[in-house]
Amino acid sequence: MVENIGNGSAELVSYAKLNLYLDVLGKRSDEYHEIVGLFQTISLHDTLTVEICDGGFYLESNVALPSDNTIKRAWEMFRKNTGEEFGLKVTLKKKVPVGSGLGGGSSNAAAILRYLGEVFKIPLEDLLNIAAQVGSDVPFFLYGGTALVRGRGEIVEKLEDIEGYSVNLFFPGIHSSTKEMYLSLTPEMYRKGPGRVEELHRAYLERDYEKIRKLSYNVFEKVFLEKHPEVMYGLRNFGDGSIVKMMTGSGSAFFALYPLDEGNYPFVGGV
């Protein structure tokens, strides 16, 4: 979402995501893993104020970020792929926890690409190609809402948006490394989920809570809890009365699913 605020700058909203389903099907020859997942954006979001400028890249943030952050990579890859020469000033107000599995960094990158695409009139197909070069989850965030995601994350099939749900979040304050979590997987852990992602999507649309509980899955949850058993204590009283409680992404955040008016963060539709 882009909102012009004058003085040549714009304000971007960058939503977090949940993995309502996430399984790893195997390791590819390019060292990435083949995944299948049901992704969903929620109302928790970061805010970016951006301005095209002369010169280089400038970033102010309320949290520490690595020098090779996703926002800078998005700017670099956009310039490389389009041939456009411009500088960029970004002020980031981050609310999505870093290392939580909620996709904050990927969402930030997608917000930048979407904004630059509007400024320089770049088609969505080209933006998706650039997004895949920035990070595996970035293409999904160009759509938002509900989507079936495959490949290493770059194959995004937009689905009918799921409405009428909200979540509460539990973040144990642990930065979970996506790379480390993937390295922790062994071949016998592949393809262990129910595999019926379209059926899970339909269960959400039909409010079939029993089937939602039955088909929800995250391959990383067991691995994460084995690495961090202390998190179980924090989860004991989290999600009481929820439809389902599970981890998102490669951790470390967990979500508890509720009907729309009972959780803090409603599901958000896509573009």
Swiss-Prot record:
It comes from the Bacteria. Pfam families: GHMP_kinases_N. It catalyses: 4-CDP-2-C-methyl-D-erythritol + ATP = 4-CDP-2-C-methyl-D-erythritol 2-phosphate + ADP + H(+). Pathway: Isoprenoid biosynthesis; isopentenyl diphosphate biosynthesis via DXP pathway; isopentenyl diphosphate from 1-deoxy-D-xylulose 5-phosphate: step 3/6. The active site is at K17, D137. Its EC number is 2.7.1.148. The keyword Transferase applies. It is an enzyme of class 2 (transferase). SUPFAM superfamilies: GHMP Kinase, C-terminal domain, Ribosomal protein S5 domain 2-like. Keywords: ATP-binding, Isoprene biosynthesis, Kinase, Nucleotide-binding, Transferase. InterPro entries: GHMP_kinase_C_sf, GHMP_kinase_N_dom, IspE, Ribosomal_Su5_D2-typ_SF, Ribsml_uS5_D2-typ_fold_subgr. One of its GO terms (molecular function) is 4-(cytidine 5'-diphospho)-2-C-methyl-D-erythritol kinase activity. The keyword Repeat does not apply. One of its GO terms (biological process) is terpenoid biosynthetic process. ATP binds at P97, V98, G99, S100, G101, L102, G103, G104, G105, S106, S107. Belongs to the GHMP kinase family. IspE subfamily. Catalyzes the phosphorylation of the position 2 hydroxy group of 4-diphosphocytidyl-2C-methyl-D-erythritol. This is 4-diphosphocytidyl-2-C-methyl-D-erythritol kinase. It comes from Thermotoga petrophila (strain ATCC BAA-488 / DSM 13995 / JCM 10881 / RKU-1).
